[in-house]
Regions:
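Conserved AdoMet/S-adenosylmethionine-binding subsite of the radical SAM
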Residues: 45-197
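N-terminal [4Fe-4S]-dependent radical SAM core
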Residues: 1-61, 67
Length: 197
């Protein structure tokens, strides 16, 4: 059971990470930092994590080790996690490549103290890399709806892959992000079509 102090340099603005769901992500992106560690077991909700003291005054990235909003995640699990987080006076970052799932929970009380983020690593679709994730444009359309609803949004362009500038700028802009995070491939054992200049 753990509320982990954030140590990475990608999200320096986050104070902690918290992972009540663990295991294989449906999106199966080969560059995922979790895939490099070991063979992951099936996705599960760790009920013991719903007993962790989340403290107060923290900015917690919930679900940093798997996409807790993927299409195969049971709604009951998401509801349990949101309800639990809402019991603490913190701010939360929820990130997904499937932001359409966010739409089901926009009226949940925890959203009043949350930021919703999606990954838009390129405007292109690389099927062998992005696999089961929704298309970047689909993500941007949903994030536009979320921003119009009044919930703060972020976009993460990581790992940044080759893109078409005008189209990528359009997708990011559609999300009306308060912040854009940009990062490169951190899995040196995986070759991606990264920008060359």
């Amino acid at each position: 059971m753990a509320l982990n102090k954030s140590t990475g340099n990608m999200y320096a603005f986050v104070s902690h990470t918290y992972n009540p769901m663990k295991g294989e992500c449906e999106h199966s992106c080969p560059y995922c930092f979790m895939k490099g560690k070991r063979l992951l077991p099936p996705l599960r909700l760790e009920l013991k994590e719903l007993k962790v003291n989340l403290g107060e005054g923290n900015f917690i990235f919930v679900g940093s080790s798997t996409d807790e909003w993927a299409a195969n995640v049971p709604s009951e699990w998401i509801e349990q996690v949101l309800d639990y987080c809402d019991g603490f006076d913190n701010s939360y970052l929820f990130q997904s490549k499937n932001p359409a799932r966010f739409l089901e929970y926009l009226d949940h009380p925890v959203m009043r103290k949350s930021v919703l983020c999606t990954t838009i690593e390129t405007n292109r679709f690389y099927p062998d890399i992005m696999r089961n994730a929704p298309l970047p444009r689909e993500r941007a359309i949903v994030m536009q709806e979320i921003a119009n609803y009044g919930i703060p949004t972020y976009v993460t362009c990581e790992p940044l892959m080759q893109f078409d500038l005008a189209e990528l700028v359009e997708l990011v802009g559609m999300c009306s992000p308060q912040q854009v995070n940009i990062g490169r491939n951190s899995r040196y054992d995986i070759t991606l079509p990264e920008p060359t200049a």
